Structure formats: structure tokens, C-alpha cells
Amino acid sequence: MIMFCVQCEQTIRTPAGNGCSYAQGMCGKTAETSDLQDLLIAALQGLSAWAVKACEYGIINHDVDSFAPRAFFSTLTNVNFDSPRIVGYAREAIALREALKAQCLAVDANARVDNPMADLQLVSDDLGELQRQAAEFTPNKDKAAIGENILGLRLLCLYGLKGAAAYMEHAHVLGQYDNDIYAQYHKIMAWLGTWPADMNALLECSMEIGQMNFKVMSILDAGETGKYGHPTPTQVNVKATAGKCILISGHDLKDLYNLLEQTEGTGVNVYTHGEMLPAHGYPELRKFKHLVGNYGSGWQNQQVEFARFPGPIVMTSNCIIDPTVGAYDDRIWTRSIVGWPGVRHLDGDDFSAVITQAQQMAGFPYSEIPHLITVGFGRQTLLGAADTLIDLVSREKLRHIFLLGGCDGARGERHYFTDFATSVPDDCLILTLACGKYRFNKLEFGDIEGLPRLVDAGQCNDAYSAIILAVTLAEKLGCGVNDLPLSLVLSWFEQKAIVILLTLLSLGVKNIVTGPTAPGFLTPDLLAVLNEKFGLRSITTVEEDMKQLLSA
């Protein structure tokens, strides 16, 4: 059987249409796993439909609320490739739905839900049979009837909500829980399960998702800073230090903290990878002296870089790609919602097996000459610099600020972002976040009167800090955010980037430039609508874009 998936930037694009519709997608996801993820999403939509009904009766089920976004997160690009675990999530979704349904019936014997997903049952234990059942829920099944524009808007909402669900899970891990956010999530998820076909309603839904995600990023920020302190500028070594070692990748700061606690005094050094780099800026994480540095570059290079790393690797969230290519599948471990067939999975917070493996491996034989980069420009630090930025602008020492960030990826056209960064004039500042920074974060950019020209604000979710800074600057200057000498040039790859974009658009931010390509699920008509309404456009050339943005 074949699949249909068009959720990431590297999806196959042909004159006949966009999307991976083969035996395997560009990410390495098999048709089986992709189809079973469609089935899981349908089960989660049914669960959310009953959660909406339960809310009408004043019933809030925390097990449902904690599970639903986490399971949805497992379908995000480069997270879980393990078909049996995807089916396990679907079974758990149905079991929770039935328990929630029973709670509703106990209050009202006539309780019912009018949603096509509300009574979904899995037809078999056989993966092949389940894959055939999943064909009923493939996202483009009614494309001929509704057209590409409606399908594209549905997917914009589905993928945006998926990105928000990922951030909800990150926040939940840190003890952050908001009943209103979960209620809104269930309402949108259930509605998407009705296969809506009204263009205006779908556009409104996409903005609602963006607004909801702003709240999610707020509680995630509170969770991270509440537990680990506010990030402050910190130098990080990106070269090897002699000794045994473990590499930890993803976004989960709690996993990193637990690993650091358990490795303290063992002689094992810990390195961050990818989106874990900003962890070095948090006081409660950098206090561990054996958190010695950051290893590697963008996630897409992991098959080469992980193969060279002389210790075990822990994946706490996206992005994982096939570890068998570099023959390190015997020393990569997955956590939480991450999965790869045949790779060992850590069900809890005990990293002792990983530590034992690290102690049995060679580690780095010698320390390389250090190369230091600076991270840790968190929300408090950025807000503390607001008056300095305004002063520099007023004295014409600072002409423009470019927010240059987002996801990285393998496409060659992404060199645009390196070229753009190195072409930014000396009297301009670069604010960066997310893993797209690896395209230029090891380069030297100098400073403007002591203020670094390259300011690393953190992970993708730390777009929240950048938004708060922009709002603060606008308030102090008595203007709107769109009137600031500020331009957003964003790279995208997966669904977290989609929901960040929806968040910015829902807040009224205009004239954003994105690349390296437009999302494959957005038709020319939809791109035209977004351009007309928000000024959203794709990158062209560095020279043309720089000229246009500086003259705006």
C-alpha cells in the first residue's frame, strides 16, 4: 500500500502534485507507519470529541488531557517510526475515550457525540489489516470532492495544531497545565475530525490555533524558567573534551537535567546536540560542570556526526533519522514519544543503562582547541537590552534587526540563510532561534558598541521571547510592531514551524519572508491569500530580499 503525507518541507514535489505517496516517504517513514499515524489521528479526534462533550458536563479528565497532545506529537515529522507503538497509542486513545464516554453517560444517560470519529474501533491486531482500515482516514481521501484549496487549509490547521500539541507536551512535562488551552485544543481537534470544508471557517481556525499557541508558548516559557532559571549569555564550547561522553538531542530540558544529575561524579561528560544547545544558558543546567559543550550541527547531518560520536546518544524529541545508516543503532536511545524500530527505548527517567554504556566506550581521546559561541539571550536578557536597542537606533548606530531563524534541513537552497546572515550590514543585528542557526552560529559577527551582532534567543518555542521583545520595543517607541526596523526571515521544515508562523500571523505580524520553499500543502491560491492578507512571501535572492527589507 502507498501513503500520503505532505507535512514537511522535504516532501516530494512533482507536476502531478505534492506529497510523499509511495512505499516510503522522504523522511524514511514507511507507508505502514504513515497510514497508522492517520489512524491514530482519527482515534485522537474521536477522543477529543468526547472531551468536548465531557466539558459540557463539567468533567475534566487529566489523563485524557495529558495523553492526547503527547500521542499527537508522535506523528510529527522525524519523531516516531515504530508502527507497533503508534498502534499502541491508538488503542490507548480508544480506551481513554470509552472511559470518558462512561463518565458522560453516568451524568446523562442520553449523552451522545455527533462526530464521525467518536465511535472508531480498531478492526484487528494485525498491522496489515489496520493499515487497510487506515485508508478510510488518509487526509486527501476526498480531495476530488473538496478541491486542493480546502484540503490545503485543512492540513494547515491539522499540522499547525500538531505543532501546538508538541509544545503542550513540552510544557506538560515541566508541570505546566492550563484547562482552557486543553479545552480549546480538544474543540479544534474534534472539529477537524468532521472533515470541514468551509474556507472561511478553516482560515479562522488557523488563526485560532496561532492564538492558542501563543498561550502555550507562554506556559512553556514559565515552565522552563521556573525550573531552570532565566537564561543569560553563556559561552559554549563546540569542540571535544577528553573523556567518556553522552550526547543528548531534542528539546526536553527535564531529560537533560535528569541525565546531568545521574551522571554527576561518574566521569561521564554530557554534550548537547541540535535544539538542546540553548540549555547551556539556563543557570540550573550550566551549574553541572560535566555539561561540557555542544556537539555537531543541524539535525540533518546526524548520520555522519552521530557515527563519529564515541558514546551513546539520547533522543528526547524530534528529530531522529535512520540510525542504521551510520551503524550507531546499538547506542542510540529514544525517550518519550520518540521511536525507531529496533532501537532501545527508555520508558522512565532512569538513564543508568545509557551511563553504563558510556563508561564502556572509548570516549574522546583528547581535548580539541576550544571554539566558543555565545547562547542564552533569553526573555529577561532581551527585555533588559530594550533601552539599549532603542538608544542605538536613535543614534543611528543600529539600522535594522533581522530575526533570522527557524528549522534547518537538507535542501541545498538552505545555504541562502548562511549567505543572508553574512550579508547583513555591520550596522544591523541578527536575532536567531531554533536549529536554523546552525547555518551561521559558528561564524564571527562582531558587535555594535559592545552589543553582539548575533543574538541567540534559544529554541524554536523561544519565538515567544522575540515576540515579547518586539511588543516591548513597539510600546516604548509608540508604534506598532510592523513599524519597527525589524524583519523576519524564517526557515521552516516541520509542524512546529507551521504553528510558530500561525502564531505570528494571528498576532498581526506582517511581511514575513519564509523559505527555502513554500509548504507543499499550500496551493498557489492559498499562498496568494496569505500574501494579500499578511504580506507573507517566499525568499528570492539574498540581494533582492536584503534590499527590499532594508528599504521597507
Curated annotation (Swiss-Prot):
Residues the entry annotates as binding hybrid [4Fe-2O-2S] cluster: H251, E275, C319, C407, C435, C460, E494, K496
Keyword Cytoplasm: yes
GO molecular function annotations of the record: 2 iron, 2 sulfur cluster binding; hydroxylamine reductase activity; metal ion binding; peroxidase activity
Gene Ontology biological process terms in this record: response to hydrogen peroxide
InterPro entries linked: HCP/CODH, Hydroxylam_reduct, Prismane-like_a/b-sand, Prismane-like_sf, Prismane_a-bundle
Binding sites annotated in the UniProt record for [2Fe-2S] cluster: C5, C8, C20, C27
PANTHER family named in the record: HYDROXYLAMINE REDUCTASE
Entry protein name: Hydroxylamine reductase
